[in-house]
Amino acid sequence: MLSFLTEVTGAIAQTSARRPIQFMVVPALLASIAYLSIIDDYIPEHIKSSSGSSGISYYHPYTSSHYKSQPDLDKWTAIDKEHINDDIYTQANQISVIPLRFRRFQDVVPNVPNAIHISDNEQILIVPTDQIENSLDQLQEITNNGITWKARNNDKLAKYYDYIRYGLNKVQDAIQHAENFDILLIFVAYLGMWYALIKVFVDMRKIGSKFWLAFSTLTSSTFAFLLALLVSNKFLHTKVSLLSLSEGIPFLVSVIGFKHKVSIATIVANSSTASPEDVPHVVGKAVSSHCLSMLRDHLVVIGGLLSCAIYAHHLTGLRNFCILSSLILSFDLILVYTFFSAILGLKVEINRARRTEDLQNALEEEGISSLVAARVAEQSATIEHPNEHNFFKSNNSSIAYFKVIMSLGFFAFHAFWLGSSWLYSTTDGGESFSRFSFLSNIPTLSQDISQQIPIGRKGTVVTILPTIFFMPSGFMVQLEDFIYLVLSKFSSAIRDSIISKFLVFGFALSIVTNVYFLNAARYQVSATHKLIEKEISRPQDSSVTATTTTTATGTTSSGAATSKTIGNNKGLKSVQEIPDNEDESSDEELEIKAPVKVLPLEECVKVLKEGKVKTLSNDEVSSLVVGGKLPLYALEKQLADNKRAVIVRRKAIAKLANAPVLDTNRLPYAHYDYDRVFGACCENVIGYMPLPVGVAGPLIIDEKPYHIPMATTEGCLVASTMRGCKAINAGGGVETVLTRDGMTRGPCVRFPTLKRAGAAKLWIDSEQGQATIKKAFNSTSRFARLQHIQTALAGTSLFIRFRTTTGDAMGMNMISKGVEYSLKYMVEECGWDDMEIVSVSGNYCTDKKPAAINWIEGRGKSIVAAARIPADVVTKVLKSDVDALVELNISKNLVGSAMAGSVGGFNAHAANLVTAVYLACGQDPAQNVESSNCITLMEKDKETGDLNVSVSMPSIEVGTIGGGTILEPQGAMLDLLGVRGPHPTNPGANAQQLAKIVASAVLAAELSLCSALAAGHLVQSHMQHNRSKAPAAGATTTTTPAITDSKASNGSIASNGKDLKRLEEGSVTCIKS
């Protein structure tokens, strides 16, 4: 049963995520209908009656005892509108009362002639009804002491000032009449509610959503509240008063909270980029994983509330609220599976689309052409999420702005026409209206008003008109009038019978169109995949197969169809295609199949001038290149086919360099994506150079296993690293620490005098200079952020070292652009117009060269990796011992490197691993110069006897976007490590992790090689020790073992054949390494 519920809820959530628009629009429409249906139930009657009314009329009969005296308030009776034209009322004395109220923004309010003062800012004007129109015209504008007061409509923004003040008064009155314990209880409940609401936004920020996920979470609960209120009021007839709602909802929110929704959103956000599954499955799994816990929590609370409703059925207010709360929880549960799941599905789509766009922007900032960057980003998204049917092809900040503006516009529009406040009670009269009350546009008849009205002989009918509000004329009044005018016109247009129908029709058409396009996009992707599968499984046509022909020289050639690599759900497969022309075929086959006469060079030149080079054959284009009419670098542009350009270039260079080897396949060129190479990685391409790629591992790095790819032609390197991985894993794996992250660029500038150069240095080193340049630098990139500027002065030349974070890119192009702009900004805006820029790179970086500044200050990622190797593992796996390793490391890596004057070379062979991993993962192999800076340290644990080994590498320069990482094989190796592309939530984390992997691989290789060297030395010493014991006449006995442990010193090694064999194996490994 439980598994059935989990499957059902997961299926519902998947359906919602697959059809997000339907499952978002329908609940929103239902919630809107519910809102419109119940809003009238909570509008106070006195406000209802005053809305749009022309006034309220009262009648007082004639009594001789009250003639020309104070009337009796109890004898005033309200007149129904149906009877206002009865004779008794038409013959009575007709008087109109105009209430006036002045908003106190000034010390003195104007005195209206013939008006009676009620309070400091309240007056009433009593006039005969037949003079009312003239009086109202005179009241439109009043001038007093140079200040113009304008009559205002209270249905504008100013009414909310009254609502807030009245609400505060009501709260204050309620507090004064409540028990202290009740006040404390309600206060704690409200604190809990606001804590839960704020926590939603805080938790959603942690998973990368600043506003919309939290807002959607609250919207889902709000919809549940409205739907529950509709069912409770209209169907169950258990209306809950506003007082009960205001006191009970905080308790409900505090008890239930939003933890399940936040947890589901967290799982979806984490899986949106890490999981290759499509969006509906990601959302469905997240929801089904919380099905049982969410059902349990909600059902327990619902059961408790219903029990309370049954037990306390005589307490109507409590019973109704318990029923409403149960309905809220039920609808909330349903909306989690529908509305909220649909929102999560859209959010995942947007995140994946945004990540693709961010990758494209980062590649463009790295200097890669926009076309290549767009293709790489799109293909990367396809590879990461092969099952994804993504219909978000672009994402722009304007979309977010549009959503914010629409949301604010909705609330603003509603605020102007809300016309009520839920803070009011639903009863008329009482103490609140004992005086002249302006919270309703039409106040009730009060004692203050009745005392000013004389009673006629036939009675008196007094009509109290809506209150006229006055405000001093100013900018805010004019702005309010403008906003009110615009919204009123818009509202009038919406209310129009014809326009409203068109709007409804357009809304329905928009929904249908969106659904149609989303389904069409999904169908197109599905149809494409089916077509690919069909092409793969179709039998090969005989006309496409290779044909073997024999030429006059007896050589054999085969014309084969090209193989194009296509990515699909199951990986990369090869699909045979029929060549459109003879470009892919050999010359010999062309002669036999379609002997075509090659145009002379002059004719080819004419075609070149006409811009129709692509119509020529490969041989004809090649003749243009050989004849010097077409540059080698222009082939891609002229032919508009990168692969064909490679073929033609090979033909041309084979003739120019007299290198027939390029006419063969010894240097391969086929089956390669040259679109990623052109404009990004290489120029004048003639093929690609295959390198064998091995894998070392798994190596546990920070409690996570990694298989490390290594491209190398050096034998035993991968095997040696594997042995180091095994030993490290036996001790628990590698621990890594990132101590610094910042790429550098060090331009050189020059000044006319030393004084100016020194002043510039001091200014750059100051806080003002650092802040100014940082602001200019950061404006050039979305990713690069300047950390620090270091300067050095040599004569009149000033060297400036910029250190910058560059996200997941290695960042050289990104930082160079920022440096250029910063220097230009210094010249043009900061008063250093006499500064001359010698070079953007002044070797103060330092890039691709040995330099102590990189060793000391660091460059790129500074990583320290350490591991503990148990003593028995050193013996059994590494075939050595701890003391020998420690002694060897001191003598070789520390003392030996120091004697050689090395800078950053205190290691055995760090460059081996750095270069191998760099080649496999698309890094710049030239940067192994500074990236291989490493010091290897080993020491023996005094308590356990284990080996503690570490490598410190202060200048590892890597990136996971840009450069060679855009090539598919190298990108695949980054995928193997799980660090391809930009990190979805923490920019720079992927590149940092790659640097940690590089350092950990170096640690494994260092450990293995040093163990082999130490074992070889031990064998040599041991053999010498054995020979010294053998009797040899006339021979000089020498017993000087270079490295011995406690066993060797007492001769026990000689008697232990196993140790001898172990050391011999270690020496063999040493020789191979």
Curated annotation (Swiss-Prot):
Residues recorded as binding CoA, renumbered to this chain, are S720, T721, M722, R723, G724, C725, K726, V877, L878, K879, S1021, H1022
- What residue stretches are annotated with the SSD domain? 182-346
Q: Which GO terms describe its molecular function?
A: hydroxymethylglutaryl-CoA reductase (NADPH) activity
Please state the Enzyme Commission number of this protein: 1.1.1.34
Spell out the catalytic residues.
Answer: E714 (charge relay system), K848 (charge relay system), D924 (charge relay system), H1022 (proton donor)
Q: Which Gene3D superfamilies match?
A: 3-hydroxy-3-methylglutaryl-coenzyme A Reductase, Chain A, domain 2, HMGR, N-terminal domain, Hydroxymethylglutaryl-CoA reductase, class I/II, NAD/NADP-binding domain
Region called Disordered, residue ranges = 542-589, 1025-1056
Q: Where does NADP(+) bind?
A: S781, R782, F783, D808, A809, M810, G811, M812, N813, M814, I815, S816, N1026, R1027
- Output compositional bias ranges, type Low complexity: 542-565, 1030-1042
Spell out the SUPFAM superfamilies in the cross-references. Answer: NAD-binding domain of HMG-CoA reductase, Substrate-binding domain of HMG-CoA reductase
Provide the catalytic activity annotation.
(R)-mevalonate + 2 NADP(+) + CoA = (3S)-3-hydroxy-3-methylglutaryl-CoA + 2 NADPH + 2 H(+)
Annotated Gene Ontology cellular components are: endoplasmic reticulum membrane; peroxisomal membrane; plasma membrane
Annotated Acidic residues bias: 579-589
Q: Biological process (GO) annotations?
A: coenzyme A metabolic process; ergosterol biosynthetic process; isoprenoid biosynthetic process; sterol biosynthetic process
Q: What induces it?
A: Expression is not affected by lovastatin or fluconazole.
Entry membrane topology: Multi-pass membrane protein
Q: Which UniProt keywords apply?
A: Endoplasmic reticulum, Lipid biosynthesis, Lipid metabolism, Membrane, NADP, Oxidoreductase, Steroid biosynthesis, Transmembrane, Transmembrane helix
Which family does the record claim for this protein?
Answer: Belongs to the HMG-CoA reductase family.
Described by its record, this protein's role is as follows:
HMG-CoA reductase; part of the first module of ergosterol biosynthesis pathway that includes the early steps of the pathway, conserved across all eukaryotes, and which results in the formation of mevalonate from acetyl-coenzyme A (acetyl-CoA). HMG1 catalyzes the reduction of hydroxymethylglutaryl-CoA (HMG-CoA) to mevalonate. The first module starts with the action of the cytosolic acetyl-CoA acetyltransferase ERG10 that catalyzes the formation of acetoacetyl-CoA. The hydroxymethylglutaryl-CoA synthase ERG13 then condenses acetyl-CoA with acetoacetyl-CoA to form HMG-CoA.
Protein name per UniProt: 3-hydroxy-3-methylglutaryl-coenzyme A reductase 1
Look up and give the organism this protein is from: Candida albicans (strain SC5314 / ATCC MYA-2876) (Yeast)
Q: What is the lineage of its organism?
A: Eukaryota, Fungi, Dikarya, Ascomycota, Saccharomycotina
Gene that produces this protein: HMG1
